[in-house]
Amino acid sequence: HKEFPVLYKGNMFKRTSDTTACIKAFVKNDWVWVDVVFRPQDLFKRGVHEWKECNPKLVKQGKKYFLNISYEQQVALHKEKIQHQRICAVDLGLTNSAVCSVLDANGTVLARKFIRHQREKDQLRRATNYLRKAQRQTGTASMPRYWNRINGLQKQILNDTAAQIIQFAKQHHVHTIVFEYLDKMRIPKGYYGAKKLRFKLHYWAKKGIQNKVEEMAHYEGMRISRVNPRNTSKYAFDGSGEVKRSPRGDLAIFSTGKQYHADLSASYNIGARYFIREIQKSISEKEWSALSANVPTLTTRTKQTLASFITLRTVFSFS
């Protein structure tokens, strides 16, 4: 799209009603006032009816022009103490768009949610296969039709996943949403063609979901936190050690023989690592060393699980 400079109120923009306005445009070598009509918006439904209206922008998309009006307000993020916090731990997996679990400061799992987009992901897989096949046949052709389809599906998955995460967090009165920290993209060996493209799309979608959720969470007064992602799926949440994956990869087989959803187990560990880190930050190094002696798994951050946090809570009480 093409974005024009900001239309400052008074000398570039004058609102005449809820759906009409005058904007100053350069037409035929002269600056003239042009009457425009735009679609009405339900500000009450969007929750911005009491917010300050900012200067609009004129945006051109294709052959159409849109008037983008933003609103602003000072929003205070929560300052709840760690012992009273309720978090939503989110694991952005492969088989599911996201797996969410709500935990409290005692390690109790209060709610769970699976967010799936099977239809969109199947369509995305077909679109990437068609794109790679067409590029092999034509060489370096850009293939805008396929890319428009892929980008549209990516945007649908991203926006819907972020909206469901925020809705789930609001439903359970969450204070903080916790994600894994995403480092630079490292493509594994043996990934090429459509498989390599899907890996890139999946990584870009995860980054986009985190950014979108952060924006929407701050709008609701929630905070965002990120934890070390290493081995969250590798270790069982019950402390039984490393897990094996089922042939499909969606189930984790514990050393005890128990089978559990791999992404759900990872979300428990993500939430536990957040609470462990916040407890460590709130006490002295001497106290933490004493606690680590009682709970040895705390010494290695990449091996911390929900069982580690529950054990920590048995020897540590909030002041």
List where the protein language model places each region.
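Nucleic-acid substrate recognition interfaces
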Residues: 1-319
